[in-house]
């Protein structure tokens, strides 16, 4: 049974369940076109969605600090120890509007990065802009006991002990190709 359809160009690539309420799910749709010599990542079909009725209805998460520009792949995680805390690793258009003033004050900030919500997705704070090669990895994992210790795979695997404010490399000296993560509880 199909429970959510966005478009013929988009599919769902990540889902995270609220550990305190299995009826609450977050899912990310990703619009992309890949050919033998190109990848177009992002478009109107890329979005973050939430359901509180086990998928009967879905609402797109918009506003509240979440990027309003064109998005690409979005990785998701809900903190097991505090289900109000949700992380999203967002690939987003870095230039949502033409920049007319090329001075530093006129430049637009990049929207790519790790976002954190402390209120189950109602509002979002951009924690950092570390999202290298987002379309390829975009895995986010939260320590089962500490909602502020978060890991995310880009190039390389990064981690933070303060909810994403401070970023450290978790894989120094190890090849950068990491497609899955698991945290030993």
Predicted regions mapped to residue ranges:
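Beta-propeller blade termini and top-face loops
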Residues: 1-185
């Amino acid at each position: 049974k199909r429970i959510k359809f966005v478009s013929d160009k988009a599919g769902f690539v990540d889902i995270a369940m609220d550990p305190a309420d299995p009826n609450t799910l977050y899912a990310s749709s990703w619009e992309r076109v890949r050919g033998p010599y190109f990848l177009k990542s992002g478009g109107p079909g890329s979005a973050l969605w939430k359901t509180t009725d086990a998928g009967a209805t879905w609402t797109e998460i918009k506003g509240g600090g979440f990027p309003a520009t064109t998005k690409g792949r979005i990785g998701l995680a809900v903190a097991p120890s505090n289900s109000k805390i949700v992380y999203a690793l967002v690939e987003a258009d870095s230039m949502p509007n033409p920049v007319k003033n090329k001075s530093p004050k006129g430049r637009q900030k990049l929207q790519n990065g790790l976002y954190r919500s402390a209120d189950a997705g109602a509002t979002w704070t951009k924690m950092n802009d570390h999202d290298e090669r987002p379309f390829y990895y975009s895995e986010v994992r939260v320590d089962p006991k500490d909602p502020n210790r978060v890991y995310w795979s880009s190039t390389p695997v990064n981690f933070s002990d303060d909810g994403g404010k401070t970023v450290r490399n978790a894989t120094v000296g190890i090849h950068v190709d990491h497609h899955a993560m698991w945290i030993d509880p």
